[in-house]
Amino acid sequence: MVFSSVSFLVFFLPCLFVLYFIVPHRYRGARNFILLAFSLAFYACGGPKFLLLMLLSIVINYCCGLLAGPKHRPTVRKAGVTLAAVLGLGLLGWFKYAGFFGEMLHALMPFIPVPQVTLPIGISFFTFQGLSYVIDVFRDDAAVQKSPLKLALYISFFPQLVAGPIVRYTTVAEEIDERHESVSEFSAGAVRFLFGLAKKMLLANAVAQVADAAFSAASPSVLFAWLGAVSYTFQIYFDFSAYSDMAIGLGRMFGFHFLENFNYPYVSRSITEFWRRWHISLSTWFRDYVYIPLGGNRCSRARNILNLFIVWFLTGLWHGASWNFICWGLWFFVLLIGEKFVWGKALSRLPALLQHFYTMLLVVFSWVLFRADTLGAALTYFAAMFGSSGVFCGERVIYYALEFWPELLCCCVAALPVKTLLETALEERDSRISRAVLIAGPKLASLALLTLSYCKLVTGSFNPFIYFRF
């Protein structure tokens, strides 16, 4: 079940709203239980056989969290956090990487069979959430959660369960115990959810057709290859940020406030800035739980480079068990090292437009690695972008450019902080009309977007979120 499906919008969500809000606010435990039950049902709809795996992950992190608490001796606390890391990452490693490493072993020793393992939905996300809780307890950054049901709600809460953002326990710990739902909060959450739904249905799914056509073409022309790469650059942003918007909006409807996961990354003027704005919950997770414990940048240059290499190798591997993702992570490692130690100062002296062009060109290249099925396919596509087909234009690029130019233009505008600039301008005017627009404008716009999105939903084909496979 996905947020942009009829079953979720027409059946799951309305039933949850009715059961949740019919319970009086003072019965917080009952409301939490309803959220937990629906979250488990939500996950079971996508992979019922893996529901036990997620429950096992919850039990592991609950027990290890108790061991890592301050009441125990240091050796017991270390054992608790170590056990959580070994078991949690062990399960993640088996289900996500057994096939990948098995294929490499099979190539060297054909008598070793390749494990046939199905990847559970959202395992990368709920594993990282559970592990961060135990580590925070061990560091005394979070209190031990003694209620297994409350910890289960934190790990399995359906808005961010299968595709993020990765929510820290400290972000929602107080709201699990005591939160204040209101009409204004519910309304703001609904508007955020509907804007995310529109991103997915009206923009991401549209440009996905261009990207799919270009990447599946046997020998695309130069312009078609570039159009496909740019289209996928828009697709992955509007697809993933749409899910984050919808998750943040849903959480807010129930009184939870998740941190932002994107901050207009395509306005960045460097790769360093890009990663401060893109998938913020993942980059900060690796910063706090891998990079800083390794020594961060408070060490020699050689050690700092090694720390960054480890982080970006793991970042690539986290996204998937393939050489494409590993090379994708190492691509950003090279660029970040270059900006930090080689050409960063020279880059900062360039005009802003050139800085932006440099950043987006390198980001587009990175998404080719991300989108291609194999490393060989990525290299072939790069060759097509620089003329290997011998055709510069071709009929297909003309067709797709004419067919999808409105969506591509909307993507260009929506990738900019236009909404923020408009809100700032209206707030500065501080007139009766501007205040009315600030209050009613987003609500009216979200209703219009809901109508358009629903039309696409009932007439279009199923197109799952990209990050579901991670």
Where do the model's predicted regions map?
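Membrane-embedded transmembrane alpha-helical bundles that form the catalytic cores
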Residues: 1-469
